[in-house]
Every structure is written in C-alpha cells, then in structure tokens.
Amino acid sequence: MRLKTLATHPVWREPRTVFGVWMLTGVIFAIVKLLIGKYNNYKIFEGVYWHAIEGLTLYGDHYPEYYDSNHYGVLFSLIIAPFALLPEWLGMILWIAGNTALLFYAISRLPLSSTPKIIIYWYSYCELMTAQGVQQFNISVAAFILLSFVLILEKKDFWAAGIIMLGTFIKIYPIVGLAFFFFSRQKVRLLVSCLFWGLVCFVIPVLYTPGIEYVISQYIDWFERLKVKNMLNMFADRSEEH
C-alpha cells in the first residue's frame, strides 16, 4: 500500500522531479561506465576533436585509442570540443548531462499542457537511459528535431533552419526537420535560412582545422562511411550505435 501511495504521489508529476531523475540517472551511468572502463563511444567523440585539429582522418582506424569508427561530420568536433578539453571523467559526465538537459528543454517547449509533457518525459525515460548508458548523441538529435518543429510553429524559421542544418552537418538525421516545411508560414524564409546556415556550418570547421581541403576530404570520407554503416545497420546491435 505504501509503495502504491509512493508511486502515485504528486511529486512524480512535477517537471523538476523528472528533470532531477533524468540527470541523476545520467550521472550514475557516467560514473559506472568510467569505473568499469566501458565508454568507447565517448572516446570516439572526444577523438573527433583532437583528430580534427591535428588534421588526421576522422573515419579511419584509431585502435587502440578506441575501436569502431566515427560516424559524425567534421562540425561535431566543435560540439564535443568543450568536453574533450576537460579531464575525461568530468567531460563525460557533463556530456551526458548536457545531452539530457537539452532533450528535457526541447520537450518542455512543445505546445502542450503540463500533463502530456509529463507523460512524454516518463514514457521516453527507458529509451533515454539506454542512450545515456552508451553516451549517445541521439539524445540531442531528438532534441534538435523537436526544437526545429517548435521554432517553426513560433514563426522563428531562421533559428529553426539553424538547428536543422547544425544537426544535419553533425549526424544527418535531423534533416528530417525539413519535413516541418509544410507547417511553416514563412517557407521561402526557411529555405533561404537553410542555405545560409548550411554555408556557415560548412565553413566553421575550416577556422580551426588544417583548412578547406581537409574539411572537404573529411566530408567525402564521411559520406562513404555512412554508406558502409547503412549497409551494416540491419546486422548491428542498435544499443551500441553512436
């Protein structure tokens, strides 16, 4: 009876409670993975930054630094940079926490009342834990898609385009945000903004990597790597996908 009372307590319907549970789970997963030494995805992620500034291929074999291959675009090196520059244990904890907080914020922005949002928070919690456990960036990918939808509804197409292009240049999948084109009341502005932000996202890595030739070569290698990945996906363990 006490367990039932606890499970139905109003505190679980408070957004701050959900946020606390989400963040606590992320920190616990990070600490456990650090202690047992199983955080290969994060090693790949931080490696993207160091390899980019050193002008090394982002998609080759970097064993024993880590196993498996990177599947993220050159721009990802900028996103992971603040975490890669920190001590590994701190960077990984903040990485998981940051991704988690972004998804929580994105859901909070949906044009829904409190109750549906709480349902979404708890319904997605199990999948969130899986992603936290393997340090996936997919948490933020989901956030990008949600935020692009919200911003388009709010007639902030310029910023929606920025999020769509940022996500696309990092991991392709957020390009599905363009499906929200039909919800836009500023369609031309959205398309022009996508072109602008696409150019910005392409140029930014040139500023801190060896140069434009390196960036172009890495984008070519990235597309080739994605082709291989797509062929293998049907046989892959999706829980380990990064």
State where each predicted segment sits.
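Primarily membrane-embedded glycan-assembly and transfer machineries that use lipid-linked glycans
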Residues: R2-W159, S184-E241
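Membrane-interface alpha helices of multi-pass inner-membrane proteins
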Residues: F158-F182
